[in-house]
């Protein structure tokens, strides 16, 4: 009854959006309104029009359409609001690999196959525009804060990106953070062993997602702000605990404020909680930036400009003159959030699947201990000799892309995609979740099989994988800014854990599914057992 009541409440909130429309979601009228699905091979493989090509290019109006009312019915009544990634699967089966959907007055063209995604990504231009960060922009405008690298577009974005790129994107620069990350991993192992000792079995951690979230937050703060904030202490500082809580608050409520009409904001608690979460995040970031500014000023006063030693990322940004403190405050919290979710969720899913697949886990351990001598700590140079470890992370990101969908607007030209001609300023949605589980691209797409990414002696070699079948870090000039750091962080921690422990699922964990809290997260606690290995 409670579930039915919630469904009725959600439906009632749509108010004037459904009033007088005669909506009958499961009746004949709804069925008759569904367009014919676009054939997958026709949409995904239609070649682009070359010079002199006289074949007819179809228009936007000929695409199958998901009506706004039907979408709201799916999200709020059928319960897909926290399962929008699975809604991609449903809609692709119904409409084909390309369909139109609406949110308010905004039209979206959804792309759900690797060739279609590639076509758009390769034509993004110098200043790719994304229009899926509007909620973040509303908060920045509300508090008169500078936009960051995720919320800025055009030439301003390009300049900001260039300033932030210097110490993050180049592999050689990212490798410089190895010692800092290993320091945080040392603390993580201590905390993990404390939790194991506290468990009834003496070897169990009840909630790996939570522990890895604290690890990822500690690591990215140490890199960006050059300060340990105590996330892995047995007793976490109050300010840090409030910050951690506020990040969850912001993400959880952003799901609701994205789809609920604006007139509900004064009536329901979601909008205020969303703003409060962001306010705490920025307050925390501002305190860390202010502390670093005070350190820089103190160095200048004591040693002059020639005596200032650039120690890390934030120090470099503030002393280079490329970013003002206001601009740094706009971007660093955004980088922080991106870094936390990428590593914590991916590592949670990786450990979960390794626990379920002991043969793969044993092969990975053999690889790691064959490269890293007993008693030694993995270093960045070691991963050139660990193809299976890289494949485990790549396969995890294929199954669980951190962001299951994102969007781009092609602003400077019309574009042909799959035989359809789209005007300038068309907004495309990349449906990463369903694309990376496409059976035409990946054999047994729902199976965790890291060997598909290795070249020799694996069944997948009989099929050519499409390079855009899984693009978890994006592509081109707007690819993930922190990719190199995230990869290094995940490689270092996964290698250390496999080196030290045999992983097993806790008995109460069972089967874990994903839910979309903007990012893909487990729907329940992932409890694991860590049994020390004999070396």
UniProtKB/Swiss-Prot annotation:
One Pfam assignment: p450
Region feature Sterol-binding, mapped onto this chain: 387-401
Residue span of the annotated presequence: 1-36
Protein name per its UniProtKB record: Sterol 26-hydroxylase, mitochondrial
UniProt note on tissues of expression: Expressed in all tissues tested. Highest expression in liver and duodenum, followed by adrenal gland and lung. Low expression in kidney and spleen.
Listed pathway(s): Hormone biosynthesis; cholecalciferol biosynthesis; Steroid metabolism; cholesterol degradation; Lipid metabolism; bile acid biosynthesis
Location (main, coarse): mitochondrion
Cellular component, GO, one term: mitochondrial inner membrane
EC number(s) from the headed UniProt entry: 1.14.15.15
Subunit structure: Interacts with HSP70; this interaction is required for initial targeting to mitochondria.
Keywords annotated in UniProt: Acetylation, Cholesterol metabolism, Heme, Iron, Lipid biosynthesis, Lipid metabolism, Membrane, Metal-binding, Mitochondrion, Mitochondrion inner membrane, Monooxygenase, Oxidoreductase, Steroid biosynthesis, Steroid metabolism, Sterol metabolism, Transit peptide
N6-acetyllysine modifications at: 286, 524
Job of this protein: Cytochrome P450 monooxygenase that catalyzes regio- and stereospecific hydroxylation of cholesterol and its derivatives. Hydroxylates (with R stereochemistry) the terminal methyl group of cholesterol side-chain in a three step reaction to yield at first a C26 alcohol, then a C26 aldehyde and finally a C26 acid. Regulates cholesterol homeostasis by catalyzing the conversion of excess cholesterol to bile acids via both the 'neutral' (classic) and the 'acid' (alternative) pathways.
Gene Ontology terms describing biological process: bile acid biosynthetic process; C21-steroid hormone biosynthetic process; calcitriol biosynthetic process from calciol; cellular response to peptide hormone stimulus; cholesterol catabolic process; cortisol metabolic process; glucocorticoid biosynthetic process
Lineage: Eukaryota, Metazoa, Chordata, Craniata, Vertebrata
Cofactor section: heme
Record-stated family: Belongs to the cytochrome P450 family.
Topology term for the membrane: Peripheral membrane protein
Localization (cell): Mitochondrion inner membrane
One Gene Ontology molecular-function label: vitamin D3 25-hydroxylase activity
Residues at which heme binds: 480
Catalytic reaction list: 5beta-cholestane-3alpha,7alpha,12alpha-triol + 6 reduced [adrenodoxin] + 3 O2 + 5 H(+) = (25R)-3alpha,7alpha,12alpha-trihydroxy-5beta-cholestan-26-oate + 6 oxidized [adrenodoxin] + 4 H2O; cholestanol + 2 reduced [adrenodoxin] + O2 + 2 H(+) = (25R)-26-hydroxycholestanol + 2 oxidized [adrenodoxin] + H2O; (25R)-3beta-hydroxycholest-5-en-7-one-26-al + 2 reduced [adrenodoxin] + O2 + H(+) = (25R)-3beta-hydroxycholest-5-en-7-one-26-oate + 2 oxidized [adrenodoxin] + H2O; (25R)-3beta,26-dihydroxycholest-5-en-7-one + 2 reduced [adrenodoxin] + O2 + 2 H(+) = (25R)-3beta-hydroxycholest-5-en-7-one-26-al + 2 oxidized [adrenodoxin] + 2 H2O
